[in-house]
Design a protein with these regions (language model features):
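Sec/Tat signal peptide C-region and signal peptidase I cleavage site
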Residues: 14-18
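Catalytic cysteine-centered active loop of the rhodanese-like fold, especially the PTP/DSP P-loop
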Residues: 158-215
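Flexible, polar/low-complexity N-terminal or interdomain linker segments that lie immediately upstream
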Residues: 19-130
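Sec-dependent N-terminal signal peptides
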Residues: 5-13
Length: 228
């Protein structure tokens, strides 16, 4: 029954994407709190400078040198460290969906009027404060992976996820929120470690989504971040 539901959801999602091809350009309005506890508005979208719009998609322009051609304007290209971590599989669990950039955008859009949805940056605080996806909240993976060591932070975070520990010590996930978790990139294991820690205590797999590409793929696609 669950697999049938996933299939129907996937078909629905494909039709939704087909009917709204411009969301990556029009964007999603997100209000988030800054490190100074102030409210800030972002239009989360794919940011493409005007001088980048007419570059032809050819081998010469995209895959020469390192890798963009020297004639491509600086505003249209970025460099990234690609030698860290270990590449991860596309799927962490058979009941857990893997998201791409468009799925995250649609999630953000619905999240603005649905308090049962959360975008989770599972990296440590210094990474989150430096740059993240607008609308994300920070819950470091270590609070869940080492819950006995970070007991106060773990229980506080758990309540924010809509779950709690009952008097008998059992977990209650009856009101658990739907989460999308991410970290630095497809080579980063912090969000998978948090996901596995959540699964270990019984968090419903169908309420966990993994944005595998993380910040590297997000920025690589020219998407809005909290660092201007």
């Amino acid at each position: 029954m669950f697999k049938k539901y996933i299939t129907i959801s996937l078909i629905f999602s494909l039709f939704s994407f087909a009917g709204d091809k411009g969301i990556e350009r029009s964007g999603v309005m997100v209000t988030t709190a800054t490190a100074d506890k102030e409210q800030k508005n972002y239009v989360v979208k794919r940011n493409i400078p005007d001088e980048c719009k007419n570059i032809p998609i050819t081998n010469k322009m995209l895959w020469t040198e390192n890798f963009a051609h020297e004639s491509v304007p600086e505003a249209c290209k970025s460099t990234y460290v690609h030698t860290k971590g270990k590449l991860l599989s596309m799927h962490l669990d058979e009941d857990l969906e893997t998201y791409g950039e468009l799925e995250v955008l649609y999630f953000l859009k619905e999240m603005q009027h649905n308090d049962q949805m959360l975008l989770i940056d599972s990296r440590t605080e210094k990474w989150f404060n430096y740059r993240t996806i607008p609308g994300a909240i920070n819950m470091p993976f270590k609070y869940f992976e080492k819950k006995d060591e970070y007991n106060f932070h773990f229980e506080y975070a758990l309540k924010h996820l809509g779950a709690f520990i009952q008097k008998d010590g059992e977990y209650d996930f009856s009101n658990a929120k739907t989460l999308v978790l991410f970290c630095n990139g497809p080579w980063c294991n912090q969000s998978p470690r948090m996901i596995f820690a959540l699964l270990k205590i019984g968090y419903p797999a169908e309420k966990l989504k993994w944005y595998r590409g993380g910040m590297q793929d997000w920025l690589g696609a020219g998407m809005t971040s909290t660092r201007e």
